[in-house]
Amino acid sequence: MAAFAHSAPCWADVQLSDLEAGKRFYGGLFGWTFRAGDGMHFADAFSGGRLVAALAAKKDGRMPTTWGVYFATDDIRATVAAIREHGGQIITEPVRAGRAGIVAQAADPGGAVFGLWQPEEREGFEKQNEPGSFCWTEVYTRQPDRVDPFYEKVFGFRGTDLDETGHDVSDDAEALVDFRMWSPEGVEPGPDTAIGGRSVITDAFPAELPSYFLVYFAVADCDAAAELTMRLGGRVAQPPFDIPYGRMAVLHDDQGAVFAVLQPTELLP
């Protein structure tokens, strides 16, 4: 398994009230298979025999039912210090996750929660950017003026606004959205090198919606995935629509966790 570059999204997991129901839902939607973790409080998810995510049983019913993303770091304590220096908060101090690695939880200045992962025996995803696996993440925030410099200073991201990419988005849903893509340090920023992004929570969203990271999974057929989600007991928050990079939908699983599916352009008919 290849090592992830510092600042790259390297892992995703979902916190659920009912772990077995989560297995049924995501197994039905993505074809995932599962292996129980130590203590049986979480399950690793596999696509085609390769590790793609984890499902975890919530330790406290008051915790949100949500997907979370983790960024790779070469030095988790240095990254924690940078987060504090640039206006973020540490929710969970670095702690060992068995022999797999060291993990921490943080929040950006707008309140969006994300994880840090310093690998040891487990690097992260064994499969991504293929159907049934992670392909993208973006943070939704009401404070882009604070959040953009935070991520660019903490992780060294270089940003590209959507209107700088050369795509004609005049007929796309994203044309109405202030959207910024992030590329890792050391590469030319742009769509070809982007590993994540930032969108803005506008007045079109519910006033009570907090800042959050939206996790995307690649699928071979976006419309079919949305239909299957409903058959499995989930719901469609945003029906399938076209963007410059494919066709996507925003969905909720049968316990309320939100995520997105993306049918990349090369898989469109």
State what each model feature region is.
Residues 9-12, 66-73, 114-117, 134-138, ...:
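Short, structured motif recognition centered on aromatic/hydrophobic residues
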Residues 2-51, 85, 95-101, 141-193, ...:
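Core segments of cupin and vicinal oxygen chelate
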Residues 106-126:
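Short, structured interface segments
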Residues 2-7, 18-20, 58-66, 72, ...:
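Short, low-complexity cationic-aromatic patches
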Residues 5, 16-19, 186-196, 200, ...:
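C-terminal functional regions that serve as terminal interaction/effector modules
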Residues 121-131, 267-269:
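A short, polar/charged loop-to-alpha-helix boundary motif
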Residues 53-56, 105, 114-115, 195-199, ...:
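Conserved beta-strand in the GNAT
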Residues 18-20, 46-51, 69-110, 144, ...:
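Vicinal oxygen chelate
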